């Protein structure tokens, strides 16, 4: 009898808990259809089932908001203005959104739960963003840890981007073994030294990452990226390798790749001011895009120089391209500084870190460095060093333009 009573009591408790959970869920999650009004324009309103995040909800309706981290909340790019609904701002958003912005309704769309109808404001350029399935033309090493991925846009289509812009690339769940990478023998030294062939990248979810374009608008029908493989650092060799860079390095000619875009704000100012470009590593991508666009498409006569930092001669690329531009344009010069030239390099050019080389060999004696516009993209330590040097020279923030990708 006691056993039967105990079982009955247990069953009642379980059923009561189930009812409470279902009731709470009904209050917390609206399972019906909701409406997201956009920019107070009835024609832009979307209707969809409740659930998920605002970033994904918009994407499901063909509205692609920039998100370099793929919705992880770390890049801070997917900011939108929520004027009604959306709940309270989350602590994870406050590292990217100021208190003033939060009061005005700004949110990270990847963190906003879609439970009820809401009203949002989006930049108009978002509605020009599209998605394409591209075909890999080539994926060749340009340096030890950098590949140039060249993609063909579907016939009859074009990506209407501006120089300095970027696209987002997608990947489904996958497993990539580094031992299967196609890497020319000349680049094997460091791969062997650090035994990088042992790594495997296993991804169990759909991922999205942003990459600056190396191509410029007149290179029709293609998108070109410079992608640095994100290997685990030597001081933490058991850390997982970069998910998207590993995926991209595994791609071969003929493979299909989904991209969306164009996005961007790292655009050249329309002035007559002197332009100084500073790059390093895969930060070459937007530098190439900008410089080619200025000299080849716009036929710009603005004074401009390009200062690129590399470790050794093996890490230099697009050398012939920039040599040709320099020969054809009196208003353009470019310089490379090697931080660790090898004995076999027979290097007689600049050596050291690029910010020091730029200062000692040009800006130190420049009559008005504060009047120049500085465009830069490279490893974080390079960016920080260049910015400090420019600040010390009195350059205002408005003349320092930084692309945080590509490095």
From Swiss-Prot:
Segments traversing the membrane: 3-23
Assembly mode: Composed of six subunits; NqrA, NqrB, NqrC, NqrD, NqrE and NqrF.
GO molecular function, one term: electron transfer activity
Cofactor annotation comment: Binds 1 [2Fe-2S] cluster.
GO annotation (BP), single: sodium ion transport
Membrane topology summary: Single-pass membrane protein
SUPFAM superfamilies with a match to the protein in the record: 2Fe-2S ferredoxin-like, Ferredoxin reductase-like, C-terminal NADP-linked domain, Riboflavin synthase domain-like
Lineage: Bacteria, Pseudomonadati, Pseudomonadota, Gammaproteobacteria, Pasteurellales
Entry EC number(s): 7.2.1.1
Subcellular compartments: Cell inner membrane
Keyword Protease among record annotations: no
Positions bound to [2Fe-2S] cluster: 69, 75, 78, 110
Presence of the UniProt keyword Secreted in the record: no
Role this protein plays: NQR complex catalyzes the reduction of ubiquinone-1 to ubiquinol by two successive reactions, coupled with the transport of Na(+) ions from the cytoplasm to the periplasm. The first step is catalyzed by NqrF, which accepts electrons from NADH and reduces ubiquinone-1 to ubisemiquinone by a one-electron transfer pathway.
Protein name as it appears in the record: Na(+)-translocating NADH-quinone reductase subunit F
Region (Catalytic): 272-389
Cofactor: [2Fe-2S] cluster; FAD
Gene Ontology CC, one term: plasma membrane
Residue ranges annotated for the FAD-binding FR-type domain, each copy included: 129-269
Reactions this protein catalyses: a ubiquinone + n Na(+)(in) + NADH + H(+) = a ubiquinol + n Na(+)(out) + NAD(+)
UniProt cross-references to Gene3D superfamilies, sorted A to Z: 3.10.20.30, Nucleotide-binding domain of ferredoxin-NADP reductase (FNR) module, Translation factors
2Fe-2S ferredoxin-type domain: residues covered: 32-126
Keywords: 2Fe-2S, Cell inner membrane, Cell membrane, FAD, Flavoprotein, Ion transport, Iron, Iron-sulfur, Membrane, Metal-binding, NAD, Sodium, Sodium transport, Translocase, Transmembrane, Transmembrane helix, Transport, Ubiquinone
One Pfam family recorded for the sequence: Fer2
Family: Belongs to the NqrF family.
């Amino acid at each position: 009898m006691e056993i039967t009573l105990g079982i009955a009591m247990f069953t009642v408790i379980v059923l009561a808990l189930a009812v409470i959970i279902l009731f709470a869920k009904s209050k917390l999650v609206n399972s019906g259809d909701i409406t997201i009004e956009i920019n107070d324009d009835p024609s832009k309103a979307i209707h969809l089932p409740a659930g998920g995040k605002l970033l994904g909800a918009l994407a499901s309706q063909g509205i692609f908001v920039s998100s370099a981290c793929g919705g992880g909340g770390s890049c801070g790019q997917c900011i939108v203005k929520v004027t009604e609904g959306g709940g309270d701002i989350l602590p994870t958003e406050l590292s990217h959104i100021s208190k003033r912005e939060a009061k005005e309704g700004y949110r990270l769309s990847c963190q906003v739960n879609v439970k009820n109808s809401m009203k949002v404001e989006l930049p108009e350029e978002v509605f020009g963003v599209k998605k394409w399935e591209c075909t890999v033309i080539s994926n060749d090493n340009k340096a030890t840890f950098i590949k140039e991925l060249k993609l063909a846009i579907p016939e009859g289509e074009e990506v209407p981007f501006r120089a300095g812009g970027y696209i987002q690339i997608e990947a489904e769940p996958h497993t990539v073994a580094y031992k299967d990478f196609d890497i020319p023998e000349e680049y094997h030294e460091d791969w062997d030294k650090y035994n990088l062939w042992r790594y495997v990248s296993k991804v169990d979810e759909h991922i999205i990452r942003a990459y600056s374009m190396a191509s410029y608008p007149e290179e029709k029908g293609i998108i070109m990226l410079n992608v640095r493989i994100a290997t685990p650092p030597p001081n933490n060799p058991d850390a997982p390798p970069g998910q998207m860079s590993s995926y991209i390095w595994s791609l071969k000619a003929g493979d299909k790749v989904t991209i969306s875009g164009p996005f961007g704000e790292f655009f050249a100012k329309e002035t007559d001011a002197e332009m100084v470009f500073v790059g390093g590593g895969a930060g070459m991508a937007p530098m190439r895009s900008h410089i080619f666009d200025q000299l080849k498409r716009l036929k710009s006569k603005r004074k401009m120089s390009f200062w690129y930092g590399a470790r050794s001669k093996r890490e230099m690329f697009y050398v012939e391209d920039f040599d040709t531009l320099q020969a054809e344009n009196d208003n353009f010069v470019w310089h490379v500084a090697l931080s660790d030239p090898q004995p076999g390099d027979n290097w007689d050019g600049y050596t050291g870190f690029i910010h020091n080389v730029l200062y000692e060999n040009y800006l130190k004696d420049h009559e008005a460095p504060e009047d120049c516009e500085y465009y830069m993209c490279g490893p974080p330590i390079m960016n920080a060093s260049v910015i400090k040097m420019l600040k010390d020279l009195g350059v205002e923030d408005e003349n320092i333009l930084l692309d945080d990708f590509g490095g």
